[in-house]
Design a protein with these regions (language model features):
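Predominantly soluble domains enriched in secretory-pathway, periplasmic, or organellar proteins
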Residues: 23-390
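C-terminal motif of bacterial Sec signal peptides marking the signal peptidase cleavage site
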Residues: 18-21
Length: 390
């Protein structure tokens, strides 16, 4: 979900009313397999990927889709049919999804819990209660979850956030570390956990720091001053962290920065590189931006690839066949590390079902498929998904 729910400010009250009234007429698609790629069945250690659809806030429409590389079949809404006794399905607003060991973890932001599943079957294991939880990171025996801590609302006195430490064996929260306001994505380098703090609920008094947590003591050892309203954070292969700032949606634009983790200082600021979401494949950082301006009352969409070895912007558009003109609201991106294929999701108007587009390494579209509502977060799996039990 975009920080502090910008999309709810950008979408008109009429559209939000339509979202509520259309819930019965346009539900999230039921479990339904569709052959989308009959021409190419891929073998290898990556069997498929899960796509977490956020779902419109307040509707409990978060859902889980799955693509099988061996069969070329995309299946929508697999969680409900595999967990028929979970009353609210996945819950309200899926915000992150990761695989660690034999478990699939999904952050369900507005339901205030992390859903833990068996990655082989997608069967529910437990829910871990964390208020206004946001993103996941893992190392050793522990999972780490960033949390806004307070209610979902813009407020000048919004609570300071924290990172929860979860024992991956007992699936219990064992510790908490206070960080900045409205913490977002996290990255681990060595024995340090870096947390991007946004302060998005405290507009215009945004946070502008990255918290550095010593994982041995699980205490915040310092804050790195970067820029206002931070969101994404991505490590490269050279000891650097790429950090995105959303700006203030008025005069201060979205930007991308590099932190050198050997000094824990900002080492580089890109000129004209807005950044909403990014993902790394080898030395190529794929990113896109959907930048809102309250001055123009309009969105500006852009794409880019950065060479993380040279810090050069290699291209300003990695989609080469014009498909980007069909993508209304890019909302998620992932790159298959084996094949170089990349995936881009389209949330459209946040009300209708979204679309997933698959592109070859050459930037030419291979296939597209309808998804759940607000398709956002993708994780590749090296575990073969077991068929549904009869």
């Amino acid at each position: 979900m975009k920080g502090f729910y910008l999309k709810w400010l950008a979408v008109s009250i009429g559209v939000l009313t339509l979202a509520a009234s259309c819930r019965k007429d346009d539900p999230v698609l039921p479990s339904e397999p569709t052959l989308v790629n009959p021409w190419e069945q891929v073998t290898g250690d990556i069997y498929g990927f899960f796509l977490l659809n956020e779902g419109n806030m307040g509707t409990n429409q978060a859902s889980l889709d799955y693509y099988d590389y061996e069969t070329g079949v995309y299946t929508r809404n697999i969680y409900g049919e595999r967990n028929p006794y979970e009353v609210k399905d996945l819950g309200d607003v899926g915000n992150d999804i990761q695989i660690y060991g034999d478990k699939l973890w999904a952050v369900i932001n507005c339901s205030n819990y992390v859903e833990v599943m068996d990655v082989n079957t997608v069967k529910h294991i437990t829910k871990i209660a964390i208020p206004n939880c946001r993103y996941l990171a893992f190392k050793g025996k522990y999972a780490y979850v960033s949390a806004y801590a307070g209610p979902v609302q813009i407020a000048p006195d919004a609570r300071i956030g924290y990172v929860a430490k979860i024992d991956t064996a007992s699936l219990q929260v064992v510790d908490e570390c206070i960080v900045g306001y409205q913490p977002e994505e996290m990255a681990i380098v060595g024995d340090k956990l870096y947390v991007a703090n946004s302060g998005g609920y405290r507009v215009p008094n945004y946070d502008r720091t990255v918290s550095v947590i010593d994982l041995k003591t699980f205490t915040e050892e310092k804050k790195i001053d970067v820029a206002i309203n931070l969101h994404r954070i991505q490590p490269d292969n050279y000891g650097n962290l790429y950090v995105s700032s959303r700006g203030d949606y008025y005069e201060i634009p979205s930007k991308t920065f590099i932190i050198d983790t050997s000094t824990d200082e900002v080492a580089y600021e890109f000129e004209d590189l807005p950044n909403t979401h990014m993902t790394l494949c080898r030395d190529s950082l794929f990113l896109y931006s959907t930048e809102w301006s309250y001055i123009t009352n309009d969105w500006t969409v852009s794409y880019a690839i950065v060479n993380t070895r040279t810090r050069e912007i290699v291209t300003r558009n990695f989609i080469k066949d014009g498909t980007e003109k069909r993508i209304q609201t890019p909302y998620g991106i992932a790159v298959n590390p084996n094949t170089g294929e990349f995936l881009v999701t389209d949330a459209k108007d946040y009300v209708r079902a979204g679309t997933l587009h698959c592109f070859g390494p050459d930037g030419i579209r291979k296939w597209s498929i309808s998804t759940g509502n607000i398709p956002a977060h993708i994780v590749f799996t090296r575990k073969k998904l077991q068929p549904l039990e009869e």
